[in-house]
């Protein structure tokens, strides 16, 4: 439609909407809105819409396919509305039906959307019984009888779709349809048409069957020659008239459709196959019998020809099977094999296979194939079972899986048909179950699931159950690596685990429930229990065996240990006993091992008589002691009355000791030595079974050692000891430990023999190095040849063996054997510090075991171990070879444990030795920060064997020694006080607490724990001050380390050393006073650490200080008596240091430092003051700012307290503090604290300090800022500094800037340096100046100067460079230009500081809300900002106003424009409210301000004149009516004159004039308003549409004000209101918030003038109190309707006025106009609709539909047109 065409009807509008949709078809938002609008119109005027769509399609024959589809979709949506069906005109519907059929016939094969849209129209109409006959008639018109050419493909599909959606509507026409179809089908040649006809016929058949289901009728006819007709696959038959009605026609159709199976198109073949299947349910049974061969032989090959159509083919076959299997009449047997072969590949698909992505059709086909087997099984179950069993023998996994899954499905789904096939299934599955490991895991898992199904249906019995058992047992374990490598397939670990779990569960189920379980499983399972391959499933086998024995015992039967045990594959009793005991290894470690041990123990107890008749008694200890112990150790939380939670390693060690004790008891009760030797031999043979299981092998070595200790045959012992060395993998730590501990167990009974053999083992290494003629010695070595690396590990094992042999030595011979034999032998190895790490670790462990073995608490007496220092030297040598930061082995941990054990021996270490060993340990341990991965497991192994059970050797010794050794290091999480108030730190030994090495997070933590034990033992052995000073000297350098872990470790060790010294000090005498030398150094370095970032360091530092002061008190001769004056540790912590793991709050930090400073001042001797201050100065540069701040505070307290004694050093002290300011600038608090000391000195040199600070560059550095702040806090300095500053600032403002030539005739104002400097200083000193009274006296002058500064520099800038030749230092730096942006920003900062100082927070808040601080920097907005500031002072600080105004009076007549401007700003700001000091009205001040503004109306400055008009406008808000009445006329005249100000080129004064008039009209009498009203209304009307949004907002506001004053009595204004109401409504949703708000306020104030109650109610509800509506669109919808109903005579005026805005420059206003138009014209009565100028309005809306700028305009126009549905 052309843009100039006139639009006058709804039909034209609908045509325009359709044109819009087709034009902007790619804009989905527009297209969707048009569709929604058409839907709305269609719901009200469906016939008009349908007529329009009909005409549109006819008038636009060249419209594109997608566009025509949209129109048809619109029709479909309209007629699909059930509410409008009754309104539809039947003639129009007939036109639409014909149109749709014509459109459908016009489509081509590629126009899918167009054709489907046409079909959707017809189908939608056909769903309704009213139109279905018309639709089908129209379709049949396109399909006349006798036609040899097929109708359009979509005509056929339409009939098919109607059959699906309305079968009852189509079936009455089906005879006619089929009568036309039958002769036509043979002429259908194209594949798409054949597909369509096949689909249609399928739908017809389904419709007939659905009608039978919904409306069953008795047969009115009987089949000729047939007695029944299949009705379902279940075999029920009924005579159904409906099918019989169409049997002849369907047979004719069947003949033609069947021929389509031979089509070349795969889709056609698939559709034809499904259709043939459906027809099989419709044709006569006799015809089906005749065509069985034909159907099968033609449908089966389709799978190969039409792969993608498999689902349709399968559906056809399923329907055919339903018809054929209903009874025995159909001869299907000869073809069953072919059918199953065709269906089976579809059943072989695995929907659960994640490696293959199956389509939805493939999954449906899979399910349909299963259904086919279900249907066929109702008649041919035995044939199907044979078939599936045969398929299971196929080599392809998919075939096997398919057969297994189908069989399982049949067992579960059609069990009644499979009951008589039990023997057939059992025999048929034997071969599958007996197959070797050539079957894939997936197939095996499927077989296991089949076995479960067989068991569920009681198919597993004595007849063929052994095959099932053999299969399950065989698949309990996966293939070996060799087998997997031979197959060259990737091992599916997850699948193997699932298979193993399924097999184990199936075996247990059989053992627990099957009646013949004993016959099947006993002793068959014993063949596998000792097989290496079955090691991972020993627990499962034991569980089954134990269950069998338990069932036999419960049944009162005895186990048969004879029958079947002659089988060589069945393991013997000794082998089983050894295997079961090995299964106890590491049982408490995890659930799997616990379950294995539990089952093994239960089996030992159950079959104990089999092992030996005398073993039944000891075997009972399993349930009496060991099983309860296992339950206790396996729990992670101990009970309340039990021992504390134990460690994993200690749990395992305790468990292993208990198991070995049980083993020893079991062996001991057997008197026959041969039995013992047989058991040891069996253990030796099983060592090779655990090549890959080091833990189990290690435990078995220990078991073998315990067993050999009970054997007296020496040669047998020697042979098996050699076997232990031969079998152990010495490169594995656990096996080395197991071998060594096993040898130690043997040594308890064969000490001399073991020592001799160990020496022989040591010679193997030397024999290996021999060559030449001595090479024959290699052949005589009793074990295999070791390479170099293995020989190294063998040496490590040998070293460990000696350590455990020493532990096994009897107490009466240990010292002699140690000195004469063992040490002499080991010294040759110990002396070589260059050996490999593994050997050094073993030697350190051996040293520790030796020291433990000869500990005085163990052997008694005062025997001295002369080689102790020698061993310590070896340990130091080993440590020195390590890298401090990098932890790569357990050597340091073992060195600490060795040191802790050695230093406990006599004689005590010398000071030099203490320093030496302490330095080496600390240097190598404290810096540790990284560790090698895998050390955690390594540590666990070490702790299990090397630590856990060692102390049990002398556990019966005095408790004091045990506690001394086991005391853990300190932590921050456990704080308490002892009897004397001394802090005690202990690790929690309760639930979940860390206790020992192997429960530490890392081996690094375990190493630190052992390091602490070593230091503790050093102090306990030499508890003197000298020892403490040596150790503290080593630890002090680590207090200030940056690394957290180093500080933590250093203070932890410090506390540990001090605490142990306090407990054991020997150099303290009662009554003898002496200085505790470490006191000053410790206090100076630890006191600042009280506020360390780490809570742990804080608490430990306080603990160290407490211990230090306690020790100092002891050294005064008081002994360990309580010092009543010493602070309480817990009280100090609770009061100052309780902050959890986060850092302390600032106030708490200060209080803590103050408290500790007072304590230090009281307790630190003057003789140690110099050392204390030196330490404090070192701490000022600590890496942690909080700590350096604390040091500065301590320095301040020290200077204040003892300044009299430091007079001579005062200058040097202050100089150093100033120098430190630059070093500690990163720490603000430290600066502050150092400056606190500086202020005390600055009082005497105040002038010099000020002069220096004045010359500092701007902006001031943090140091200078802090200095000014400190100076201003001094009460003597503050007033003097203020007076000096104000005098200098006032003088500098006479010439605040200079004009700089920028080139090109352009100059710039550059601010001078002096005003900036003084303002910057003023901003600093007013922050915290004291006293406040001095500031308040000078407050008016300060404010005046700052406001003057802003007015003076508002349009200036900072100098970019310094003047040439200037010798003054550079003050205005680039940093200042970046920070302050503009010079006025410096005054803003000063004002803010002043307000903060005077606690005028509300003034700041007022400025923030108005964003006035930012406006102060803008040359156009600073006046408004100052106004906000002054008015806030009037409200919040009225006492400041009068002095400020008085100070400004002398500026009023100044020649300087900034001074006059400042005076006018103050005067204008005080018009609204002028107050006295007490906050009351000050008329005198107000009059002065008004006169000042009146006098300034003629000022040369435009901004001053503008400000005067604005200020006089504020007179409306004055509280004095007298003053208002005196000056309102003058103010109004001033505002009116402002409208015609000749210098006002940008309407700025005009805007202020309108604003002023807006405020003054309410104060003017009616006569005066009436006199100015015409002029104001004339002036204001054009302002509504001005580009300036501020002017628009002011105009709307003034219009509202005028109306509220004179509108009620002025018809002239009422007329203007109706004229302008459209503008108000449209701008209510203006682009700018201010305009929107003013419109809302004006409408709210003027609604009474409309004299419409409904309008008033609506406005009061939606625009309550002048607020904007919550939803503009909803408000306009309601209000427009009210306007139309209230003023029907003006409705056309409103519509035309609104249409004028269709061409607005604002897209939002155009949107609003369209929306308002739609709402105004919605729902009008017919008479009112007749008054509307349709052509203008409708044409405008159509033009908006084509808006090219904004899509929202087109959407709004579309929505508006939807509301015009009644304009038809």
Curated annotation (Swiss-Prot):
Name assigned to this protein: Maestro heat-like repeat-containing protein family member 1 homolog
Keyword list, A-Z: Lysosome, Membrane, Repeat
Its job: Lysosome fission factor. Recruited to lysosomes by rab-7 at scission sites and homooligomerizes to mediate the constriction and scission of lysosomal tubules. May sever membranes by inserting amphipathic helices into one bilayer leaflet. Lysosome fission is required to maintain their steady-state number, shape, size, composition and function, and to accomplish regeneration.
Native organism: Caenorhabditis elegans
MF terms in GO: membrane destabilizing activity
The family this protein is said to belong to: Belongs to the MROH1 family.
InterPro entries given in the database record: ARM-like, ARM-type_fold, HEAT_Maestro, HEAT_MROH2B-like, Maestro-like_HEAT, Maestro_heat-like_prot
Subcellular location: Lysosome membrane
One GO cellular component term: lysosomal membrane
Alphabetized PANTHER family for the sequence: MAESTRO HEAT-LIKE REPEAT FAMILY MEMBER 1 (PTHR23120:SF0), MAESTRO-RELATED HEAT DOMAIN-CONTAINING (PTHR23120)
GO biological process: lysosome fission
Subunit organization: Homooligomer; homooligomerizes at lysosome scission sites.
First and last residues of every HEAT repeat: 4-47, 164-203, 816-856, 1166-1204, 1483-1521, 1731-1768
Top-rank lineage group of the source organism: Eukaryota
Pfam families: HEAT_Maestro (PF21047), HEAT_Maestro_2 (PF23210), HEAT_MROH2B_C (PF23227)
SUPFAM superfamilies named among the record's database cross-references: ARM repeat
């Amino acid at each position: 439609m052309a843009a100039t065409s006139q639009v006058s009807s709804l039909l034209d509008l609908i045509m325009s909407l359709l044109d819009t949709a087709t034009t902007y078809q790619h804009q989905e938002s527009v297209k969707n809105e048009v569709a929604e609008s058409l839907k709305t119109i269609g719901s009200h005027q469906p016939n008009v819409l349908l007529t329009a769509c009909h005409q549109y399609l006819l008038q636009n024959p060249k419209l594109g396919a997608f566009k025509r589809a949209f129109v048809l979709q619109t029709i479909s949506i309209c007629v699909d509305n059930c509410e409008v069906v009754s309104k539809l005109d039947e003639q129009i519907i007939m036109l639409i039906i014909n149109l749709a059929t014509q459109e459908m016939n016009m489509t081509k094969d590629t126009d899918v959307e167009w054709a489907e849209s046409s079909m959707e129209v017809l189908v939608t109409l056909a769903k309704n019984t009213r139109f279905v006959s018309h639709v089908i008639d129209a379709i049949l018109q396109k399909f006349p009888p006798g036609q040899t050419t097929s109708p359009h493909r979509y005509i056929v599909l339409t009939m098919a779709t109607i059959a699906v959606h309305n079968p009852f509507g189509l079936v009455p026409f089906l005879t006619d349809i089929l009568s036309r179809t039958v002769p036509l089908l043979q002429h259908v040649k194209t594949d798409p048409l054949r597909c369509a006809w096949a689909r249609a016929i399928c739908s017809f058949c389904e419709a007939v069957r659905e009608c039978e289901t919904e409306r069953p009728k008795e047969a009115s006819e009987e089949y000729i020659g047939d007695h029944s007709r299949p009705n379902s696959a279940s075999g029920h038959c009924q005579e159904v008239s409906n099918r019989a009605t169409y049997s002849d026609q369907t047979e004719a159709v069947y003949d033609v459709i069947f021929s389509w199976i031979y089509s070349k198109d795969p889709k056609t073949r698939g559709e034809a196959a499904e259709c043939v299947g459906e027809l099989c349910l419709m044709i006569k049974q006799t015809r089906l019998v005749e065509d069985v061969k034909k159907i099968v032989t033609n449908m089966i090959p389709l799978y190969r020809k039409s792969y993608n159509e498999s689902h349709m083919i399968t559906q056809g076959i399923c329907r055919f099977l339903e018809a054929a299997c209903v009874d025995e009449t159909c001869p299907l047997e000869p073809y069953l094999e072919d059918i199953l072969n065709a269906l089976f590949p579809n059943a072989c698909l695995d929907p659960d296979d994640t490696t293959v992505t199956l389509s939805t059709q493939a999954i449906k086909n899979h399910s349909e194939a299963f259904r086919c087997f279900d249907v066929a099984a109702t008649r041919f179950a035995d044939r199907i079972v044979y078939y599936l069993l045969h398929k299971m023998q196929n080599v392809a996994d998919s075939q096997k899986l398919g057969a297994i899954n189908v069989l399982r499905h049949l067992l579960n789904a059609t069990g009644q048909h499979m009951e008589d096939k039990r023997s057939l299934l059992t025999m048929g599955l034997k071969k599958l179950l007996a197959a070797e490991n050539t079957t894939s895991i997936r197939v095996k898992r499927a077989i296991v699931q089949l076995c479960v199904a067989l068991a569920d249906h009681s198919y597993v019995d004595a007849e063929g159950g052994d095959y099932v058992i053999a299969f399950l047992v065989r698949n309990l374990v996966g293939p070996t690596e060799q087998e997997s490598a031979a197959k060259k397939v990737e091992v599916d670990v997850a699948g193997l685990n699932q298979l193993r779990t399924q097999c184990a569960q199936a075996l247990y189920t059989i053992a627990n429930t099957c009646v013949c379980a004993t016959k099947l499983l006993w002793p068959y399972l014993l063949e596998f229990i000792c097989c290496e391959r079955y090691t991972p499933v020993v627990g499962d086998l034991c569980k089954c065996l134990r269950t069998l024995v338990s069932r036999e015992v419960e049944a009162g039967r005895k186990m048969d240990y004879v029958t079947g045990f002659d089988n060589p594959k069945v393991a013997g009793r000794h082998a089983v006993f050894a295997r079961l005991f090995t299964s106890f290894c590491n049982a408490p470690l995890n659930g799997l091992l616990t379950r294995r041990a539990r089952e093994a123990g239960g089996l030992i107890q159950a079959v104990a008589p089999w092992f030996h008749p005398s073993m039944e008694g000891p075997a009972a200890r399993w349930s009496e002691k060991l099983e309860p112990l296992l339950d206790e150790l396996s729990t992670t939380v101990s009970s309340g009355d039990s021992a504390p939670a134990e460690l994993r390693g200690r749990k395992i060690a305790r468990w292993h000791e208990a198991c070995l004790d049980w083993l020893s008891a079991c062996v001991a009760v057997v008197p026959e030595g041969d039995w013992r030797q047989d058991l040891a031999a069996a253990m030796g043979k099983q060592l090779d079974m655990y090549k890959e299981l080091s833990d189990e092998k290690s435990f078995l070595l220990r078991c073998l050692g315990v067993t050999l200790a009970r054997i007296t045959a020496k040669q047998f012992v020697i042979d098996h000891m050699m076997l232990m060395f031969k079998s152990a993998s010495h490169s594995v730590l656990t096996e080395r430990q197991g071998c060594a501990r096993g040898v130690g167990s043997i040594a308890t009974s064969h000490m001399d023999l073991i020592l001799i053999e160990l020496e022989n083992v040591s010679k193997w290494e030397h024999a290996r190095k021999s060559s030449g003629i001595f090479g024959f010695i290699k052949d005589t070595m009793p074990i295999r040849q070791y390479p170099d690396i293995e020989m190294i590990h063998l040496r490590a094992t040998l070293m460990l063996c000696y350590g455990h042999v020493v532990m096994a030595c009897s107490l009466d011979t240990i010292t002699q054997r140690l000195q004469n034999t063992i040490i002499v032998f080991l010294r040759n190895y110990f002396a070589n510090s260059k050996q490999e790490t593994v050997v050094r670790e073993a030697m350190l462990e051996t040293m520790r075991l030796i020291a433990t073995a000869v500990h005085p608490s163990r052997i008694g007496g005062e025997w001295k171990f002369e080689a102790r220092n020698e061993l310590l030297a070896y340990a130091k040598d080993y440590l020195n070879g390590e890298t401090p930061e990098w932890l790569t082995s357990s050597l340091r941990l073992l060195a600490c444990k060795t040191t802790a054990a050695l230093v406990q021996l006599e004689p005590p270490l010398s000071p030099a030795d203490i320093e030496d060993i302490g330095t080496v340990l600390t240097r190598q341990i404290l810096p540790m920060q990284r560790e090698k991965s895998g050390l955690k497991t390594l540590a666990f192994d070490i702790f299990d064997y090397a630590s856990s059970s060692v102390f049990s050797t002398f556990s019966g010794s005095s408790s004091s020694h045990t506690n001394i050794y086991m005391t853990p290091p300190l932590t921050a999480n456990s704080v308490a006080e002892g009897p004397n108030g001394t802090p005690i730190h202990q690790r929690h030994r309760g639930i979940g607490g860390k206790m020992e090495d192997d429960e530490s997070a890392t081996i690094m933590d375990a190493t630190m724990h052992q390091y602490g034990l070593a230091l503790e033992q050093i102090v306990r052995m030499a508890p003197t001050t000298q020892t403490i000073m040596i150790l503290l000297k080593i630890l002090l350098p680590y207090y200030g380390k940056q690394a957290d872990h180093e500080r933590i470790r250093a203070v932890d060790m410090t506390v540990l050393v001090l605490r142990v010294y306090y407990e054991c000090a020997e150099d303290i005498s009662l009554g003898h006073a002496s200085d505790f030398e470490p006191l000053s150094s410790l206090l100076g370095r630890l006191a600042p650490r009280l506020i360390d970032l780490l809570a742990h360091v804080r608490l430990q530092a306080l603990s160290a200080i407490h211990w230090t002061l306690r020790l100092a008190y002891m050294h005064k001769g008081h002994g360990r008596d309580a010092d009543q004056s010493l602070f309480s540790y817990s009280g100090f912590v609770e009061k100052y240091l309780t902050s959890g793991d986060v850092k302390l709050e600032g106030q708490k930090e200060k209080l803590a430092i103050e408290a500790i400073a007072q304590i230090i001042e009281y307790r630190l001797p003057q003789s140690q003051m110099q050392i204390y201050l030196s330490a404090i100065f070192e701490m000022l540069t600590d890496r942690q700012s909080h700590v350096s701040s604390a040091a500065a505070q301590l320095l301040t307290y020290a200077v204040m307290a003892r300044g009299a004694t430091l007079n001579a050093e005062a200058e040097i002290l202050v100089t150093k503090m100033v120098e430190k300011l630059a070093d500690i600038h990163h720490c603000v608090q430290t600066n502050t604290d150092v400056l606190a000391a500086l202020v005390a000195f600055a009082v005497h040199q105040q002038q010099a300090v000020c002069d220096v600070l004045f010359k500092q560059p701007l902006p001031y550095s943090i140091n200078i800022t802090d200095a000014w702040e400190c100076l201003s806090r001094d009460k003597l300095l503050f007033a003097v500094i203020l007076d000096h500053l104000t005098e200098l600032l006032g003088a500098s403002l006479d010439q605040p800037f200079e004009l700089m030539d920028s080139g090109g005739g352009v100059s710039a104002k550059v601010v001078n340096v002096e005003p900036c400097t003084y303002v910057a200083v003023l901003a600093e000193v007013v922050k915290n100046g004291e006293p406040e009274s001095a500031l308040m006296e000078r407050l008016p002058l300060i404010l005046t100067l700052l406001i003057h500064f802003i007015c003076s520099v508002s349009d200036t800038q900072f100098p970019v460079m310094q003047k040439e030749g200037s010798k003054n230092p550079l003050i205005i730096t680039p940093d200042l230009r970046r920070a302050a942006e503009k010079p006025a920003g410096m005054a803003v900062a000063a004002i803010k500081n002043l307000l903060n100082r005077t606690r005028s927070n509300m003034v700041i808040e007022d400025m923030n809300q108005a964003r006035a601080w930012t406006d102060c920097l803008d040359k156009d907005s600073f006046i408004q900002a100052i106004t906000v500031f002054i008015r806030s002072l009037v409200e919040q600080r009225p006492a400041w106003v009068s002095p400020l105004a008085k100070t400004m009076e002398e500026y009023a007549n100044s020649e300087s424009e900034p001074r006059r401007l400042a005076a006018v700003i103050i005067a204008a700001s005080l018009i609204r409210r002028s107050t006295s000091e007490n906050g009351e009205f000050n008329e005198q001040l107000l009059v002065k301000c008004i006169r000042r503004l009146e006098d300034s109306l003629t000022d040369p400055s435009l901004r001053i004149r503008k400000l005067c008009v604005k200020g006089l406008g504020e007179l409306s808000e004055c509280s004095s009516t007298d003053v208002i009445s005196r000056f309102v006329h003058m103010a109004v005249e001033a505002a009116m004159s402002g409208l015609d100000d000749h210098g006002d080129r940008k309407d700025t004064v005009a805007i202020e004039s309108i604003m002023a008039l807006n405020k003054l009209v309410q104060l003017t009498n009616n006569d005066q308003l009436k006199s100015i009203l015409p002029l104001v209304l004339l002036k204001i009307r054009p302002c509504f549409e001005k580009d300036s949004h501020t002017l628009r907002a002011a105009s709307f506001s003034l219009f509202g004000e005028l109306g509220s004053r004179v509108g009620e009595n002025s018809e002239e204004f009422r007329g203007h209101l109706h004229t302008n109401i459209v503008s108000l409504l449209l701008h209510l949703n203006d682009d700018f918030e201010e305009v929107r708000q003013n419109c809302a306020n004006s409408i709210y104030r003027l609604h009474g003038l409309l004299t419409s109650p409904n309008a008033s109610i609506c406005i009061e509800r939606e625009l309550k109190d002048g607020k904007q509506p919550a939803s503009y669109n909803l408000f306009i919808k309601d209000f427009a309707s009210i306007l139309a109903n209230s003023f029907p005579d003006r409705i056309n005026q409103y519509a035309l006025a609104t249409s004028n805005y269709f061409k607005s420059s604002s897209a939002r206003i155009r949107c609003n106009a369209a929306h308002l138009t739609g709402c105004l014209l919605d729902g009008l009565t017919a008479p009112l609709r007749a008054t509307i100028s349709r052509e203008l309005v409708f044409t405008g809306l159509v033009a908006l539909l084509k808006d090219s700028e904004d899509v929202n305009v087109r959407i709004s126009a579309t929505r508006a047109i939807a509301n015009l549905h009644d304009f038809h």
